[in-house]
UniProtKB/Swiss-Prot annotation:
Organism from which the protein derives: Arabidopsis thaliana
Domain F-box, residue spans: 2-50
CDD domains: F-box_AtFBL13-like (cd22160)
Designated name of the protein: Putative FBD-associated F-box protein At5g56410
Matches recorded under SUPFAM superfamilies: F-box domain (SSF81383), RNI-like (SSF52047)
Disulfide feature: none
Length: 503
């Protein structure tokens, strides 16, 4: 039915304006007297300083006429917000988003604007304050931490988070804290410990943020992402999130230790660490179906230390393996061995350097093909560069040994060896699928396409064939013969057959 019935003309116009960027909505004020103040009733406000202002300050030196225009534009925006936000006529400000780079924006102004939004029952608040170097942090009003209407809070860069001892955010479901500074370690912990309906949490730490330890113990949490930079003074972090479904960890701390207690509902994981916590992280997520692993440069040794450990990903179906200036063939091979049900593999080495023993390694592995290549891998994707020998050798290994592969996507950039790599992979893509497979593996593969009864009958052919039937992956028992010729002996033979075969 007609969705606008019952709206007055002004209400309808405000509704239409709410779908426009705030800057565009403000420009409509010159159309007529009716439109002059309509934008001041908008429930959602978004003010973005030009990113070029930030680049200008970081560049330094003399300024051109264009630079002066940018500065004047930023100054006008500051004066506009400072003048009009206190007079905003909407009784409820559903959303306020501020992105600020200019030094002219004072921390006290940001404090005032946030306080106005809180007084208007704000639901979503996003503040990014990134002035040039040396600017002091913006301290937000204490009323923010008792805002009952607040559902989403996103703070970034030069924000000082000072959580009072008594606070209440009963509606907060999304909390993003990106490279902010905390008044003390207890501020972060108080905030994390008293958000009882929180579902989405992002904590990205920076050097000098006044935090050494933190614990995420939130029963309602569904998504968790955290980042610890290499120079951060971290000692320990604890994670206890029984409802968590998505987990992203970027841990480059040199001294931090992790303790992960309970994540039984986890479905997807992204892990990138400096290496010393990788074993604990992977041991705690062995039951996930989707895993993305990012290997940063100069950390290959820490990761390959896992090679041979008894960690099995019994449920893993999707693996994304990304390397950056690193050589990690051994770790990738170990992951393939540890993932017997893997269906989709993506390998990204667009920015990697090759190890000297790449080709030798994958050729040595030809006699020990991972089970997932023989029975489950259906999709392989390689994103590489034209000089990547490691990626080429991996792709060759996959194409040569994957028995169930349905789709192979090869995307490589420019490089001296691009054409040679493409030609070689094309040959492997069209080659027969039994090259390099041992006789027993090949025979078992053939038997898997035959009815179980027929496969069993081959056991009388020779000693080599005697026990091959026990390695067949697909079993099918059919008592049709018992139904067409029912007798006690036929039923007994069938039961004995099944019992003997399953031993």
């Amino acid at each position: 039915m007609d969705k606008i019935t019952g709206f007055s003309d002004d209400e309808l116009l405000v509704k239409i304006l709410s779908f426009l960027p705030t800057k565009a909505a403000v420009t409509t004020s010159i159309l007529s007297k009716q439109w002059k103040f309509l934008w001041m009733r908008l429930p959602k406000l978004e003010y973005h300083d030009d990113i070029k202002i930030y680049i200008l300050y970081m560049r330094g030196g003399s300024r051109s006429r264009t630079d002066s225009i940018l500065l004047e534009k930023s100054q006008r925006m500051w004066r506009f917000i400072d003048k009009n936000l206190p007079l905003h006529s909407s009784p409820v400000i559903e959303s306020l988003r501020l992105t600020i780079y200019n030094e002219l924006f004072q921390p006290e102004s940001i404090n005032l604007w946030v306080e106005i939004a809180v007084s208007r029952c704000v639901k979503e608040l996003s503040v990014r304050f990134s002035p040039f170097k040396g600017k002091r942090d913006a301290l937000l009003p204490t009323t923010l931490y008792t805002c009952k209407s607040l559902v989403t809070l996103k703070l970034r860069e030069n924000i000082l988070v000072d959580v009072p001892h008594v606070f209440c955010l009963p509606s907060l479901k999304t909390l993003h804290l990106s490279h902010v500074t905390y008044a003390d370690e207890e501020s972060l912990q108080r905030l994390l410990s008293n958000c009882f309906v929180l579902e989405d949490l992002v904590v990205e730490r920076r050097v000098g943020d006044n935090v050494r330890n933190f614990a995420v113990i939130i029963p309602s949490l569904l998504s968790l992402s955290f980042e610890i930079l290499g120079q951060c003074s971290s000692e320990e972090y604890v994670i206890h999130t029984p409802s968590l479904k998505y987990f992203k960890a970027r841990d480059f701390g040199e001294c931090s230790t992790c303790l992960i207690l309970n994540m039984p509902k986890l479905e997807e994981v992204f892990v990138s660490t400096a290496g010393h916590n990788i074993k604990k992280l992977l041991e705690s997520v062995t039951y996930v179906k989707r895993l993305s692993l990012f290997i940063p440069d100069n950390n290959a040794e820490a990761f390959t230390a896992l090679y041979g450990d008894v960690i099995v990903f019994n449920q893993l179906e999707h693996l994304t393996f990304i390397i950056w200036e690193a050589y990690c063939s051994k770790l990738l091979y170990w992951l393939l061995i540890a993932s017997p049900k893997l269906r989709n593999l993506e390998f990204n080495d667009q920015f990697s350097s090759d190890g000297m023993d790449t080709l030798v390694f994958w050729e040595q592995m030809i006699t020990s093909v991972p089970q997932c290549l023989l029975s489950s891998l259906q999709t392989f994707k390689w994103l590489g560069n034209g000089d990547s020998i490691e990626g080429k050798d991996l792709a060759t290994f996959i194409l040569r040994n994957s028995c169930q592969l349905k789709t192979a996507t090869i995307s490589i950039g420019q490089g001296q060896n691009k054409l040679e790599i493409e030609k070689e992979l094309l040959l492997h893509q069209n080659m027969d699928k039994i090259s390099g497979i041992s006789d027993d593996v090949l025979l078992v593969k053939i038997l898997s396409f035959r009815p179980t009864k027929v496969a069993v009958s081959t056991s009388v052919l020779s000693k080599q064939w005697k026990y091959l039937r026990k390695r067949v992956l697909k079993l099918e028992y059919d008592d049709t013969e018992c139904k067409t010729k029912p007798s006690k002996s036929s039923h007994k033979r069938f039961r004995c057959f099944v019992k003997r075969f399953c031993k």
